[in-house]
């Protein structure tokens, strides 16, 4: 009887210790700028992501213009810092850079997000604006992967986007069922489009523009926070882009103010920034860490 009681007591002690460790790990993750978050039921990733579309279109971006492999080097540095979400688009022409940066890394250690351009004019050549199931093989080859975590309809700018682009819904849903993608969503560049996306049942995740300085975003802070809140209430992943206004918030004070504000905004999962130097990554992560500490008080 004593031996049984000892075993039971010891087992209870181990369970309590395990629970304490788990709580400590969760608390540490909650305060880490690169802690893991659940973007969708299928995708767990870092709360900070690396964007590759600064001043991008027709498969050119600042990552191309920098040259000399600087973008690849920056992404490798970001990965080493714990950033594991990498955001791309067909119209950015950055698939190959991300594939090069992540070569040799375990596939389950990072998240790939890309976008399909559907609007007439700009973006990519007209003949290449195809349904997702006709693009997936090229995307997989360019990214050197067997699956893509998240594919989005890119740059929604009008409230009629459902009627215009629902031809992409079924192909993407089939790709998800086949395991070639894990989730599908939209990238919103107009508030009217975002308001619809926040409620639409097809949308697993949405990109929303938000910063404290109202740069490169549609509407004010409160209007966009309300959209993010609606999206979260409807079970959607929320990715905040333009946190630094695509470089237009160009003072240390402004960047810190906006980063902390977005970090403390509760209705989001991931924040993405188009980092162009290692010191930009360091500064952003420091500001996110400060925002998390302030929120935890």
Residues covered by each model-derived region:
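Conserved beta-strand positions in the central sheet of alpha/beta enzyme cores
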Residues: 49, 85-87, 149-152, 185, ...
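Beta/alpha (TIM)-barrel catalytic core signal, keyed to glycine-rich beta->alpha loops juxtaposed to Asp/Glu
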Residues: 4, 33, 156-297
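Conserved, mostly hydrophobic/aromatic
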Residues: 50, 86, 112, 148, ...
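Active-site mouth loops of central-metabolism enzymes
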Residues: 54-68, 119-130, 250-251
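Acidic (Asp/Glu)-rich catalytic clusters
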Residues: 40-42, 99-107, 140-144, 198-201, ...
């Amino acid at each position: 009887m004593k031996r049984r009681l000892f075993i039971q007591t010891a087992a209870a002690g181990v369970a309590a210790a395990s629970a304490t460790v788990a709580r400590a790990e969760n608390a540490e993750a909650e305060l880490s700028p690169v802690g893991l978050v659940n973007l969708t039921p299928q995708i767990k990733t870092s709360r900070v992501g690396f964007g590759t579309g600064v001043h991008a279109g027709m498969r050119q971006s600042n990552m191309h213009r920098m040259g000399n492999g600087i973008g690849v080097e920056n992404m490798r540095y970001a990965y080493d810092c714990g950033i594991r979400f990498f955001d791309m688009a067909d119209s950015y022409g950055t698939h190959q850079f991300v594939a090069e940066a992540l070569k040799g890394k375990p596939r389950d250690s990072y998240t790939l997000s890309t976008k399909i351009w559907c609007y007439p004019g700009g973006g990519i050549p007209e003949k290449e604006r195809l349904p997702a199931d006709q693009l997936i093989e090229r995307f997989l080859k360019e990214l050197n992967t067997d699956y893509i975590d998240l594919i989005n309809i890119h740059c929604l700018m009008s409230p009629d986007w459902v009627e215009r682009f629902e031809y992409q819904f079924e192909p993407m849903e089939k790709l998800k069922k086949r395991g070639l993608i894990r989730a599908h969503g939209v990238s919103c560049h107009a508030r009217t489009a975002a308001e619809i996306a926040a409620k639409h049942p097809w949308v697993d995740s949405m990109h929303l523009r938000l910063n404290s300085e109202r740069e490169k975003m549609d509407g004010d802070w409160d209007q966009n926070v309300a959209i993010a809140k609606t999206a979260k209430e409807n079970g959607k992943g929320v990715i905040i882009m333009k946190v630094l206004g695509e470089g237009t918030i160009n003072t240390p004070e402004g960047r810190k103010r906006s980063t902390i504000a977005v970090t403390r905004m509760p209705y989001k999962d991931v924040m993405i920034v188009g980092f162009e130097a290692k010191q930009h990554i360091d500064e952003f992560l420091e500001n996110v860490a400060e925002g998390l500490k302030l929120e935890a008080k």
